[in-house]
């Protein structure tokens, strides 16, 4: 469990690859990427997640070959909220303005609205059904980047307590500007953009 936190918070690609190989080794007695990818596909199928575009090359995402759609990754986020391991998973994601790869992002935005003792009744009511890690205003976001690629995926808890699953991939020569777009989109969600 602590390994997953290290992988996600710090975007540790070497450790992510080792998890795939370990999964393969434990389930098949042969630690290789092919078996690890098959185990993941079997798990997805068991959870009614058909992802024909999915390509797993090394398990870390640090690849020009690996593929998954934003919509399918968002479905995994929705599945994650209902998982018995949800707290471990959600707490493993970097928290905007607090830690990991999101430590220096959205800091001013979040300072402006961090809940205090006057937290609204709406916020409390909307969050009753969610795990403790999704009961505080903010963003739990895994980031990813390659040359010409920027991505985010995770959960945003808005000012009113609405929880949004969000995934965005930018594949473009100007993807470096994607950080600005992603932060703007996350800010919009923090402000309950879809509800306005």
Model-derived segments and their meaning:
Residues 12, 98, 158, 169-173:
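Solvent-exposed coil/turn segments that connect beta secondary-structure elements
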Residues 44, 51, 90, 134-136, ...:
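Active-site lining segments that contact anionic ligands and/or coordinate catalytic metals
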Residues 183-196:
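Short, gly/Ser/Thr-rich active-site loops of penicillin-recognizing serine hydrolases
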Residues 66-133:
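A conserved catalytic-loop motif detector
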Residues 112-115, 124-159, 169:
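Short, Gly/Ser/Thr-enriched beta-strand-loop segments that form substrate-interacting elements
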Residues 6, 17-21, 153, 162-172:
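Short, well-ordered beta-strand elements
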Residues 1-88:
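A small/polar active-site loop signature that marks catalytic segments
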Residues 172-181:
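A short acidic/glycine-rich loop-to-helix N-cap element
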């Amino acid at each position: 469990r602590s390994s997953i936190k290290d992988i996600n918070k710090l975007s540790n690609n070497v450790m992510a690859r080792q998890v795939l190989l370990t999964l393969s080794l434990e389930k098949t007695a042969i630690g290789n990427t092919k078996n690890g990818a098959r185990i993941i596909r079997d798990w997805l199928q068991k959870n009614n997640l058909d992802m024909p575009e999915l390509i797993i090359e090394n398990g870390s995402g640090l690849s020009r070959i690996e593929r998954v759609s934003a919509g399918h990754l968002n479905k995994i986020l929705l599945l994650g909220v209902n998982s018995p391991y949800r707290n471990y998973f959600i707490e493993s994601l970097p928290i905007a303005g607090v830690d990991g790869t999101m430590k220096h992002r959205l800091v001013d935005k979040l300072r402006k609205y961090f809940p205090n003792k006057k937290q609204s009744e709406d916020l409390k009511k909307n969050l009753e059904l969610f795990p403790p890690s999704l009961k505080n205003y903010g963003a739990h976001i895994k980031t990813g980047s390659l040359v010409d690629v920027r991505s985010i995926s995770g959960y945003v808890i808005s000012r009113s307590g609405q929880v949004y699953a969000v995934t965005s991939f930018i594949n473009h020569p100007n993807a470096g500007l994607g950080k600005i777009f992603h932060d703007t989109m996350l800010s919009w969600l923090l402000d309950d953009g879809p509800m306005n």
